[in-house]
Structure formats: C-alpha cells, structure tokens
Swiss-Prot record:
Pathway: Phospholipid metabolism; phosphatidylcholine biosynthesis
Membrane topology: Multi-pass membrane protein
All ranges on the Cytoplasmic side of the membrane: 108-113, 221-227, 303-304, 419-422, 495-499, 587-979
Record topology, Lumenal segments: 1-86, 135-199, 249-281, 326-398, 446-474, 521-565
Root EC class: transferase
Residues passing through the membrane, by range: 87-107, 114-134, 200-220, 228-248, 282-302, 305-325, 399-418, 423-445, 475-494, 500-520, 566-586
Compositional bias (Basic and acidic residues): 40-56, 716-732
Gene Ontology MF terms: phosphatidylethanolamine N-methyltransferase activity
Protein name in the entry: Phosphatidylethanolamine N-methyltransferase
Keyword Cell membrane applies: no
EC assignment: 2.1.1.17
Subcellular location: Endoplasmic reticulum membrane
Catalytic activity as recorded in UniProt: a 1,2-diacyl-sn-glycero-3-phosphoethanolamine + S-adenosyl-L-methionine = a 1,2-diacyl-sn-glycero-3-phospho-N-methylethanolamine + S-adenosyl-L-homocysteine + H(+)
Length: 979
C-alpha cells in the first residue's frame, strides 16, 4: 500500500458520535438542518457578549435559533452531594441500589447467572433500545413527533395539553437540573425532547455499568495454583487498563461535552467548533474502541472466562451500534456531498469520439468537471479486484487464484503433519514472504527510478493501462499466495489442545483470534482509505499523482501496516506457540519494515516531498506527554535509524549490478457480486369497525410521465396471431396507463370529510395482493400518509402536497357530494425500480383495510431501436443513444438537480459515488434498453451520460457479430445487397 492515504477524492473523516468535530452547519440533502453558521442573529448576539459570558447557540430543523444552556455530566449530577437531586435522580439511584442489594442477598450459586442476565438486559437496552430510538429519530424525527403529538411541552393554560401533571413534573425536573440560562416554556421542543431522552440514557448507562461491575464481582476469583508473580501481573495490568479506560472517557467528555455525549445532533445542531486532541488523535472511534479497555482489565482482575466472553459480546454489540446507528447519521449530517460544480460547456466545440477511438486513452480523473475534457476521453475500467464481492471467475486472475488456493488447501489438509511436510510448508511460506517483500520491492524500486515495468509493456506495443492491469494481477497473486502459504504452514504446525482449561491455552486462542481480527480490520481500513489505486501502489505507475490526504486509519498512523497490519501473524504465534511460526512472524515483520523503509518511504519522499507528514496523530499525542529528556532521546534514535537506512540503501545501490534479474509472473484478480434478497414481512390487520364510511366516497386517480412510444408498441412482438398484432380497440375514454421507469407519479385522492387522519396510500405490485378488501403484504416504505403530523415519522410525509381540500364531486351513482381531497407524489425510494404492473391502495386509519384501489398501471422501459436510424454512422447512433439515455438517467437520479445531469456532458453529483442504488438503477435500465449488462461501478466511473453512451456504443460493436439486427451485426443478404 502506498504510504499515507493517496486518493483522487476528497475525504472527510467522520468520528463516532461520541467523538466527532461539531462543525459549522450546512444544509443537508434531505432539507433538514445541517451544520452551518447559525445566521445573523447568532452573530449579532455573539458580538455583544463578553468573554466571560460565552454562549452556545443551537438551531432546530425549522431554523429556530436558541441559546444552549450549560449542563453537567451524568456522574456529577447523580453522585455529587453538592448537586441538587430531583425525582429522576432518586429513581436512578434507587435502581442502582436494588442491583447492589440483589448481589448481597442472592445465593452465591445463582449470582453469576442472575447478573449475566441483568447485564445483558441493560446492554440490550443500550444497543437495541437506544439504538432504535436514535435510528427512528435520525430518519423520521420520531421522538420529536411524539412530543409534538402529545403536547407534553405545551403550557396547560392554553388548553392544548391533556397532561398537566406530567408537564409540571417535567418542568420541575429539567429546571432543577439546569438552573442557568434555561426556561422550560421558551426552549424549543427539540431541546426539551433531548433533555428527557438524556434522563432515559442516564438510567440505562448507569445500570449498564453497575450491573457489569457487580457481574465481575460475582465472577471474581483466584485460579488454583496461581503464584504471587502472576497474581501481581494480573492486577497491575488490569488496573492499568481500567485507569486508561477512565482517562479515555474523561478526555473524550472534555472534548465533545454533553452535546455529542448524549447524541445531541440527532435533535438539533450547535454553532461550535471543537478542538480534537488527546484521545481523538490516538484511535478511531475512541469511545467504542480503546474506550472499552476497562472491560478487559476487569476481566483480567476477575480471572473469569465467563466475564471475558460477555465483555467481548458487549464490545461487539457496541460496534454494531456504531455501524448501524451512528455512522449513517454522521455521514448524513456531517459528510453531505458537496454541491456539484457546473461548468458551461460549448457543445459546438465538443466533437463526438470516432468509431475507432484509441483503447489507450488516459484514465478520467473523477475530480475533472469540464464536460469538454471528459467527453474527449475514453471512460476507465472499474473492474476492482479486492473483496469477495468483486470475485469474477471470468477473469483469469480470479479463477487462477481460486484454483491455486483450492489446490493449496487440499495439500495442507490431506498431507500428514510429519516433520518433513512441516519443513516444506514452512520453507514455502518463507520463500513466498521473501518474494512478496524483496521481489515485489525490487520491481517497485525499479519502477520508481526508471519505469522498468511500464517500459517492458511499451516495448511490445502495450499501453500504460495494460502495464497497470498486469501489475495488479501480479501483486494480487503474490499477496494471496504469501498469506495462503503462511496459513498452510500455521495449520501444519498447529495441534488441537487436549485440555482447553489447562494453563493459558484458552486465553492464548482468544488473544490470537483477536489479533487476527485486528489485522483484518486494519487491512479493510487501509483499503477503504487508499482505494485500489493506493493499495496497488498506483503512484508508482502514474505521474499525475493524486492529492495526498490523511483520512481513515492514516489519521492516526503513518504506516499502519508496520505494526497493526501484521498483528495476525503474531496472533498465529500465540495460537500455535511453535518456533517455526515465530520464525515466520519475525521474518514477515522484518521484511515488511525493510520494504516500507527502502521502497515506499523513498518513493513517497520523492513524489510528495515536504507535504509528507512527519508525525501521525498517535505519535503527536505521545510526544506531548513525554518529558523533555525522553523527547531528546527519541530524536537521537530517529537519527540513528535514518543513518542506518541510508547506509543500507547505498550498499544495495552499489550491489545492484550484481543482483540484476528479470521478474515475470502471472496475472490474476478478484471480482463477483453477491446479491441481497430483501425479505418481505406479511402483516394482516383488519379494521374492526368501518361503519359510517362509504367506500364510494373514496377514489384514487393517477398522473405520470407516459412511457416512450417504443414501449407502447412492444406488446406486439410478432409472436402472436395476426389479429393480436394490431393495436387493440379501446372502449371508453380511458387510455392504457404506462409510465416511465423512475418518473414521479402524482396521486390524487378523495375521501369522506370525516375520514381518519391516519389514512395512508401505498404502492404495490398487482400480483402481490389477491384480496381487494385487505392488504396482506408490507409496502416496504412505499407509502405516504394523507395528513401531516398523523404518524410518528416525517418520512411518511415526504411527497405530501395537499390534504383535506373540500371539493364537490359526482359519485359513481351520479349523486353530488362534498368530499375531502388531496395530492401526493411518489418518487425516489417510494417507487418500484423494476418493470411490472402496479397499483395504489388507499388504507383506513393506519391499518390495512382497503378503501380504494387505483387503476393498474405499467412501468416499462422501451427497447432502443437503432434499426430506425438511417444509415450505419457511428455518430448518429451515439447521438441517438445519448438522447434516449439522458431522461432515463435523470429519472434514476430522482430528478434531483444536485445529482441528475441536465446535459449529456454534465458530471453526475457526488452522491452517486456514495450511494450505490443510483448506479444500480441505471445499469438495470441500460440492460432493458440496449440488452447490455454493465456493473454498477461502470456508471460511477463514466461520470456522465456521454461517456456511458460511448461505452454502450463500444459494447454494441464488440457484440455485433452475435446480433441478428441489420445495424448491429451480419444478417442474411437480401436482394438489394446482392449483385
């Protein structure tokens, strides 16, 4: 991997919610509040305040600006005698006391099981309960909707609050806790909701921590036969981890304050810049990574495997909480895609590519927005290698690697573990490691100095792109064989323990597996930061070096592969405890460090010069904590290392003529797609009482963009009888409803004046429901409520235009009647992104009782007919493809001006690269229109409609011999072609 994070893209590193920079607010893509400056009002107030009266300003989604009062941390509020106590504090302390009394009075035989269940309950309340609440709040602002619907924060004197006792209790509770700069009546609903949510979080977090400590006490003991030295080591190490954990929590709270500690930005945003130092420079997501070191310290002091396993389970649950709840919200709130740069394009000067455009054109830079520049370059390939989802057995790289791995695994499993076989497997692993570091290092060193690898392919008329692809295959094969041979050698040297409870056997396996998992995570983080370009040392092959960025794991470490990237080999050492594996681990680590110092580092210095960072975040944090004498010692050690490395480089340079050799290898790589099949939940709910509602008063009518003419005429395919080939006679004035793929559909509805405010309309496939009276399948999010503020989510209101407009209409029996009417638009994620026949269903009172069903309508993508284009000119065909493709791409991108292009040259919005659903929609449409199947990565790589049209034209040319259409391939000669 090529040094620090090298990438053509711009990266914003998003920390965990408990540790992220609260940046100035900007608008988000969904129209909600996002971090940007909070307006002139905040600035004026800020100018007027003195340094001693600094205030923090918050902003709600509707734009309300308010002063955020200072709050105290949870532990101080609960345990400090100087802090005023209210009813909720007493309740939390009482629950904690019950836990302690339970430990005291439970019989010793049942304490462990009881407190294991209690701790798992509170951990589930944290990760599942709080996680669900935050997920719903992030996506639909559910908690705020609950508060507004119940009117619990509205003054009872207005007559709108049906819960005056609850109102007074909350007012007393919150104003007692926040005596300064806070008024319960004047605070926004979002802020009050957050304060109530905080009290729930306080209860769960305190009980979670208390039950864990009590569970540790119940499990604690001293192993039989343990000596004093081991006892002292256990307790010293355990206490050190606990103290480190305590420092992490305190330092994290010092940086992020209560706002981020209690997930405040799920409710509102603040105008404040936080300085990230200390623990946030040491590790990613420190609250969830190193912030759980105390769990393992307590497990070590308790000497209990039960406690250790539950600690690992709780830690894993916390990471799941981070991935499923916090990270999506962080990405949506703080890492919204930047506005698209639009460049005026002189279309008169943009010439279409010729039919025989060179296959060796340069790769398009993703950051180039000039339509003219992009239009004249051939789109690049996006056939990635790494990852199980990229395995493609049609590629010789992937198929060869897979076959070799199968053969290698068979040899390792089927051969006996005799000393002779063990020797050959260890020797094989050592040779592959030497090749991976020395051989690959030599190639990269020569490539850096004289472009040796590229020159070889140019000599035979190949391009730089071909050299790059061949190199990727060589490196990928070498890497997979290196680790496969190491795993095989480890397997040969490993023997299953006869007694897992003997000594440290089980602990060694747990620590070894943890180190292996750490290496896998490190490799995934490196790949996420570098991409394929950096992973395969792309800056050794392309002079137009990308911008140097430090994102992801490189924010904390300059060379993570130096230590963490080899944690797995030392995990294997712990598991096997054999000298041979120790030798392989030492060899691997030594050669890796030599590779970094002798190959990567000189090239990075030559390429990036002074822009290279000397110290990473972790090193800076450690240096700040060192005394001056140790800092001087560190500097002298660095000088010695630099002098030694310089001597080795000079020695190798002098000996190079004697070591000359050619290096050749095979080509192999990985890519295939695993598809997820969404499960459907069938829900049957029948409204018990529909009396008083006449279904004749309900109706649904549709408006949408009619599909293209080719789609209308495709029903007559020539396979029918003669009568069926003509257009059908339609009786009545209603035309067939056939809408464009992905186009918004407007739904107009009517209902009785007294209809339920919780009525809703859903979109379904016609074949999904056999009953017209009740819907028996979930809408999977494709529904909209007929009235605002009727459901506990704002998502169901997206697309709602109007509600309860009284109109006079004639019913089917001819009787005029006043009814309520409304309009809504289904678009984006509320549509089906496939072809078929669909219908809308009007449902009663939040249930699944059907009151009205719309006319069935069809979504169809018309086939592109290039036979209709006069002649066989490439330019005409491509122009026609561009014209047909542009509206389809716009529909696939939800017609969002920040994403969808307005012209064929305009670049797609950056959100297309982040969310794969957009590119998957496009490749489906292209497959249906042109019969050509692309991978979603191709759409992202092309970047605009013109490049995609070029790729379609090129694919049609390549596949022309297999087509029987006149323009696409050879056909049977006709009389006019003969003679």
């Amino acid at each position: 991997m090529s040094g620090p994070a090298s990438s053509t893209g711009f990266h914003i590193h998003a920390e965990g919610l408990h540790g992220r920079n609260v940046q100035p607010s900007k608008p988000t893509s969904d129209g909600g509040v996002a971090p940007t400056a909070l307006g002139e009002k905040a600035r004026v107030e800020e100018d007027e305040r003195t340094d001693s009266e600094k205030k923090t300003f918050g902003r709600t989604p509707d734009g309300t600006i308010f002063t955020v009062p200072p709050t105290r941390d949870m532990v101080s509020q609960l345990l400090s005698p100087s802090e005023p106590k209210n009813l909720s504090d007493i309740f939390v302390l009482a629950i904690i006391s019950c836990h302690i009394f339970l430990l005291r009075f439970l019989p010793s035989s049942s304490r462990v099981a009881a407190f294991a269940i209690i701790f798992l309950f509170w951990r589930a309340a944290y990760n599942i309960g709080i996680g669900w609440l935050l997920h719903m709040q992030s996506n639909g602002r559910t908690l705020v909707c609950w508060a507004k619907k119940s009117n619990i924060f509205v003054n009872p004197s207005t007559g709108q609050n049906p819960h005056p006792v609850l109102y007074n209790l909350l007012k007393w509770e919150l104003e007692t806790k926040i005596p300064e700069q806070y008024s319960f009546e004047d605070a926004p609903t979002e802020y009050n909701t957050w304060l109530v949510f905080r009290r729930v979080v306080d209860l769960i977090l305190m009980c979670d921590f208390t039950s864990y400590c009590l569970f540790a006490i119940a499990c604690g003991g001293r192993p039989a036969g343990e000596g004093f030295i081991m006892l002292a080591l256990r307790w010293i190490t355990g206490m050190s981890l606990v103290l480190f954990n305590l420092w992490v929590k305190l330092d994290a709270h010092r940086v992020v304050k209560d706002f981020a500690w209690y997930w405040g930005d799920f409710f509102y945003l603040i105008d404040q810049d936080l300085t990230f130092d200390g623990v946030f420079e040491m590790a990613p997501h420190p609250m969830y990574s190193v912030g759980y070191a105390g769990y393992y310290g307590i497990s070590l002091m308790a000497a209990s495997y039960k406690l250790l396993f539950i600690s690992i389970l709780a830690h894993a649950a916390q990471f799941a909480f981070l991935v499923l709840v916090e990270n999506p919200h962080i990405e949506k709130t703080y890492n919204a895609p930047p506005p698209r740069k639009r460049v005026a394009v002189d279309t008169d000067n943009v010439k279409p590519q010729d039919d025989d455009v060179s296959q060796d054109s340069s790769v398009i830079n993703d950051n180039v927005y000039s339509g003219q520049a992009v239009a004249t370059l051939e789109p690049s390939s996006m056939h990635n290698l790494l990852g199980p989802h990229n395995i493609d057995l049609y590629r010789i790289t992937d198929s060869s690697v897979l076959l070799i791995q199968i053969l290698f695994s068979a040899l390792a499993i089927l051969t006996p573990s005799t000393p002779v076989y063990q020797f050959f497997f260890v020797l094989n692993a050592a040779l592959w490691r030497v090749w991976y570091s020395v051989g690959i290092g030599y190639i990269l060193n020569r490539q850096s100095h004289c472009k040796m690898w590229t020159r070889h392919f140019v000599k035979y008329g190949e391009s730089n792109q071909e050299a790059w692809q061949q190199w990727k295959g060589t490196y990928h094969l070498s890497m997979t064989m290196t680790y496969a041979s190491f795993i095989a050698a480890t397997w040969k040297m490993y023997s299953f323990p006869q007694d897992w409870g003997y000594g440290l056997v089980l602990l060694r396996h747990i620590l070894g597996a943890s180190l292996i998992a750490l290496q896998i995570w490190t490799s995934a983080s490196i790949y996420e930061s570098l991409g394929e370009f950096g992973w395969f040392f792309g800056d050794f092959f392309f002079d137009q070096s990308p911008k140097l960025t430090y994102s992801g794991i490189y924010r904390y470490l300059n060379n993570p592969e130096r230590v963490l990237g080899l944690a797995g080999v030392w995990g294997a050492v712990l598991i096997t405890s054999t000298k041979s594996v120790i030798f392989l681990a030492l060899l691997s680590h030594t050669l890796t460090i030599a590779f970094i110092q002798l190959v990567e580092r000189p090239h990075m210095q030559k390429l990036y010069g002074q822009s290279l960072r000397r110290d990473a975040g972790l090193v800076r944090s450690l240096k700040r904590s060192l005394p001056p004498s140790l800092k001087q010692f560190h500097g002298s050690v660095d000088k010695i290392l630099d002098d030694s490395i310089e001597f080795i480089e000079e020695f190798i340079e002098a000996a190079r003529p004697k070591l000359a050799a050619g290096v050749k290898t095979f080509v192999k790589d990985t890519s295939a797609l695993f598809q997820k099949y969404p499960a459907r939940i069938t829900i049957s709910r029948l409204e018990p009482d529909l009396a008083g509602y006449d279904q004749k008063d309900y109706s649904i009518s549709l408006e949408g963009t009619q599909s293209s003419e080719p789609a209308q005429f495709e029903r007559a395919s020539g396979k029918e009888g003669e009568k069926a080939r003509s257009m059908p006679d339609r009786r009545g004035d209603k035309k067939n409803l056939m809408f464009e793929y992905g186009a918004p559909i407007k739904v107009k509805w009517t209902a009785p004046l007294n209809h339920s405010k919780k009525d809703w309309i859903g979109l379904y496939m016609v074949t999904d429901n056999t009953s017209r009276e009740i819907t028996r399948i979930s809408s999977q999010g494709r529904w909209i409520g007929t009235n605002k503020a009727s459901f506990d989510s704002l998502t169901c209101e997206q697309g709602l235009i109007s509600s309860d407009i009284v109109i006079n209409k004639f019913r089917e029996d001819g009787e005029p009647k006043d009814v309520a009417s409304g309009e809504m638009v289904f678009s984006g994620d509320k549509l089906w992104w496939t072809q078929g026949v669909f219908e809308f269903r009007y449902h009663h009172n939040g249930k699944h009782s059907v009151m009205a069903v719309s006319r069935p309508f069809e979504i169809r993508i018309g086939r592109f007919d290039d036979d209709a284009i006069y002649g066989d000119r490439y330019g005409l065909v491509r122009a026609a493809i561009e014209s047909a493709l542009l509206p389809v791409v716009q529909n696939c991108f939800d017609r969002d001006p920040e994403i969808a292009p307005q012209t064929v040259e305009e670049q797609y919005g950056s959100l297309v690269d982040r969310n794969g659903k957009y590119s998957r929609r496009v490749v489906f449409a292209v497959h249906q229109m042109f019969g050509i199947e692309f991978a979603p990565e191709v759409v992202r790589a092309d970047g605009n409609v013109r490049n995609l049209a070029w790729r379609i034209c090129n694919a049609k040319k390549v596949l022309a011999p297999y087509s029987m259409s006149r323009t696409n391939g050879a056909t049977t000669p006709t009389a006019e072609h003969e003679g």
